Amino acid sequence: MSHQQPLSSSVQPTDIYGGDEVSALVLDPGYCNTRAGYAGEEMPKQVLPSFYGHINGRDVFGDEYIVPKPGFEVRNYMNRDSVVEDWDAATRMWEHVLVKRLQPERSTPPSKKGINISDDGDVPMEDDGNNNEDATDALEKPLAENPLLMTEAPWNSPKAREKAIEISMETWGVPAFWLSKTPVLAAFAAGKATALVIDVGGANTSVTAIHDGMVLKRSIQRSPVGGVWLSSQICKMWDGSEPKVDVVPRFMVESKKPVEAGAPAEANLRKFNFDIHPSFRAYEEERVLTEFKESVVEVWRGPQRFTTPGNEDAVRTQPGRVFEMPDGSNQMWREQRFKVSEGMWDETAAYNSTDEEGRVTKAQTIPALIKAALEGVDVDLRPNILGNVVVTGSTSLLNGFNDRLNHELAQMYPGVKIKIHAAGLTTERRFGAWIGGSILASLGTFHQMWISRKEYDENGAGIVEKRCK
């Protein structure tokens, strides 16, 4: 397979191959969000939560439909390893975002426009009983004009890879398909064909070495220390606070009054005449935790660890940050906002957790992942790879993250020239893999790489293992 070269930073995709001429779609499914859009564009047009609602035997997609209702359950089609667990739900979710959201004019045949759309905005699990093949052809093969590039985790299984091309070719009728690993695409988005990609996402953190546009398989490292893990650390911190901090999700608050910092909330809570499903409550609590992460949590920049004597006392004298809960209660956070993220770097600093998911070992910390990844790389390649460290993923947007990473790398590899490439824009850091896919799929030189329908018909789903390395 020929190696895929990224664009230089001075060349835009549309300069090489007009974006409006390309009907290729790029789909980047993740544990927290699913991103989709057209190749050649700078950002995904659609970003939907990978969490979806399930009520009365039907699935509903889109954040606007995740609202409190009797029996309303929140599910995710992926597991915490960022691998698809429920293929039926994944297929429906992807089709919803690729057709209904991206190309609404093609999502329903003219004969049925406006007829079968429910007020829940859902995609029913069953068809509506119309067996007229001609009338439903547009629904059966909704992507017959769109080549599709899909992203995958570097540890994705061969079975899952074959399932992805099967759905794309058989169910959606795509004319061409490609499957690309997220670290390769994140490197391409940064203009690199060789890099060490550190992806700190919602469900996990991975470190992968890329050489000439190919994943070095022995380098692949991952750990559950990502955004969801950080949320569990915040919950531990709140539980141990004086006074204890209770998470009251926004949907439960009817009205509130301003109160002093540390004072009890004065809020009227909504009363529901049905039980709220625990999965819905957890999903809504995660929204509050995400706000706290984005506005309060910070990474200790170094050069020493946060636990080094004197550091915590020094932070206590600095201005803190106030966070207001949805119920109006608020509190000033100083040293705690650094301590809560320190377990990502130093396992001894993590809040103790009784559940296995919340625990962190030394091998799961970011420095240990980097060390293990580079040990899987030929010694001669290491300097070049360390000179191109690409940081991506939403959790890498924590204040101070890049400074700390720089200090850790400098301590681990003294004398080696280290350069970190981290997009300054929030959207570019969150959508690194999607942007790389958009660049790749819009290249005129990439057209020879696509797996065509003819190749698929001749070789079956196994072609994806041979072609998409």
From Swiss-Prot:
GO terms for molecular function: chromatin binding. Residues 119-136 have a biased composition (Acidic residues). GO terms for biological process: chromatin remodeling; DNA repair; regulation of transcription by RNA polymerase II. Pfam families: Actin. Residues 104-136 are annotated as: Disordered. It is found in: Nucleus. One of its GO terms (cellular component) is NuA4 histone acetyltransferase complex. Keywords: Activator, Chromatin regulator, DNA damage, DNA repair, Nucleus, Transcription, Transcription regulation. InterPro entries: Actin (IPR004000), Actin_CS (IPR004001), ATPase_NBD (IPR043129). PANTHER family: ACTIN. Chromatin interaction component of the NuA4 histone acetyltransferase complex which is involved in transcriptional activation of selected genes principally by acetylation of nucleosomal histone H4 and H2A. The NuA4 complex is also involved in DNA repair. Is required for NuA4 complex integrity. Component of the SWR1 complex which mediates the ATP-dependent exchange of histone H2A for the H2A variant H2A.Z leading to transcriptional regulation of selected genes by chromatin remodeling. Component of the INO80 complex which remodels chromatin by shifting nucleosomes and is involved in DNA repair. Belongs to the actin family. ARP4 subfamily. Component of the NuA4 histone acetyltransferase complex, of the INO80 chromatin remodeling complex, and of the SWR1 chromatin remodeling complex. This is Actin-related protein 4. It comes from Neurospora crassa (strain ATCC 24698 / 74-OR23-1A / CBS 708.71 / DSM 1257 / FGSC 987). The lineage of its organism: Eukaryota, Fungi, Dikarya, Ascomycota, Pezizomycotina. The gene is arp-4.
